Amino acid sequence: MGRQVKVVTDNRRARHDYFIEETYEAGIALTGTEVKSLRNGRANIKDSYARVENGELILHDMHISPYEQGNRFNHEPRRPRRLLMHRYEIQRLYGKVREKGLTLIPLKVYFNERGLAKVELALVKGKRLYDKREDIAARDAQREIARALRERQKV
C-alpha cells in the first residue's frame, strides 16, 4: 500500500475569481528547509502566479514560512521557485498564455504518493464582477431546490 496524497495548501479563491480552462501537474524545485516547512503545512499560495521566463516555468509570490528548527541557512519565504515540467509542456503553456491572454495560477500544493512536492497549476481567465454574481445566484438557486426537495420528502 502506498502513501496517501497529502494536500499542504489549497487556493479556494481561485475557483471563485477565475474560469479554469485546464489544469496541469508540476514538480517544485525546493531546498531542504522548504520541504520540512511544507511537510508541517506552512505555505500560502493565495496571491501567487506562474510565468515562463527564459524557457523555464517560475512560481512567484508563494510563501513558505521559515522552518522553526532551521539555522542561519534557512530559506527566503517568498523567493521565486522553479517548476519542473517537460519542455514541450512549458512551450505549449507559453503559447496559450501569450495568445489568449490567460494566466497560470496554482490551485493546490501537495505531496504525491512517492512523497514528492507537486503543485497543481491552472490555466485561467479572470472573471468579471457580473460573472461572480451569476455564479452566486446559481449556487443559491441550487440550494433552494435541494431544500425544497428535502422538505417534500419529509411530508
UniProtKB/Swiss-Prot annotation:
PANTHER family noted in UniProt: SSRA-BINDING PROTEIN, TMRNA-BINDING COMPONENT OF TRANS-TRANSLATION TAGGING COMPLEX
Record's protein name: SsrA-binding protein
BP-aspect Gene Ontology terms: trans-translation
UniProt superkingdom: Bacteria
RNA-binding is among the record's keywords: yes
Family to which the UniProt record says this protein belongs: Belongs to the SmpB family.
Location in the cell: Cytoplasm
Primary location recorded for the protein, binned into one broad class: cytoplasm
UniProt gene name: smpB
Keywords in alphabetical order: Cytoplasm, RNA-binding
HAMAP family membership: SmpB
GO terms for cellular component: cytosol
MF annotations from Gene Ontology: RNA binding
Function comment: Required for rescue of stalled ribosomes mediated by trans-translation. Binds to transfer-messenger RNA (tmRNA), required for stable association of tmRNA with ribosomes. tmRNA and SmpB together mimic tRNA shape, replacing the anticodon stem-loop with SmpB. tmRNA is encoded by the ssrA gene; the 2 termini fold to resemble tRNA(Ala) and it encodes a 'tag peptide', a short internal open reading frame. During trans-translation Ala-aminoacylated tmRNA acts like a tRNA, entering the A-site of stalled ribosomes, displacing the stalled mRNA.
Disulfide bonds: none
Cited Pfam families: SmpB (PF01668)
